[in-house]
Design a protein with these regions (language model features):
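ABC ATP-binding cassette signature C-motif
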Residues: 1-172
């Protein structure tokens, strides 16, 4: 269920303590997380989009950041919008931008295509297909799962775990 997958991701990111056991990541692991609820990053925040992204970028100059945001489908004056007025899809694109700038080699995405239009969903698909690291993905988007997954770990209602190498369609 969705509550459990979100809890698992929060445990993996160290935002929530597990009831039992522990999580240990390798020393060279750099993680980035796209939470299903991204409101804490935006609610009440009056920063302009370009300045919001600047805080997550090693490169701080406007030309680089505006070019980056352009590739994320933000045009011209959109980069000066306050982040608290962005649409749900725009906020997801902001969070994906933040992830790309993080240098992560492991990304955790909790329902990444929620609130996105078709063009943005296709861009997410392409980006994940090209990502050289590890992707942990929770999604109801069959197309996204089919195009990006080469291993499925499914938690069953009875507590068993299915771990299958292959595509999502192979799992089904």
């Amino acid at each position: 269920n969705e509550l459990a997958q979100t809890a698992l991701f929060k445990i993996l990111m160290g935002e929530l303590e597990p009831d039992e056991g522990s999580v240990k990541w390798g020393v060279s692991t750099i993680r980035s997380y796209l939470p299903k609820d991204n409101s804490p990053y935006f609610d009440g925040n009056q920063m302009e989009l370009v300045d919001w992204l600047r805080q997550y970028s090693a490169k701080k100059d406007d030309v680089y950041l505006r070019g980056f945001l352009g590739r994320m489908l933000f045009s011209n004056e959109d980069v000066f919008k306050p982040v608290n007025v962005l649409s749900g899809g725009e906020k997801v694109r902001c969070m994906l931008s933040r992830m790309m700038l993080s240098g992560a080699n492991v990304v955790l995405l909790d329902q990444p295509t929620n609130h996105l239009d078709m063009e943005s969903i296709q861009a997410v698909n392409k980006g994940l297909e090209a990502f050289p690291g590890v992707v942990l993905l929770a999604s109801h988007d069959h197309e996204l799962l089919t195009s990006t997954c080469n291993r499925v770990i499914a938690f069953q209602p009875d507590g068993t775990i299915i771990d299958k190498y292959g595509t999502y369609d192979d799992y089904l």
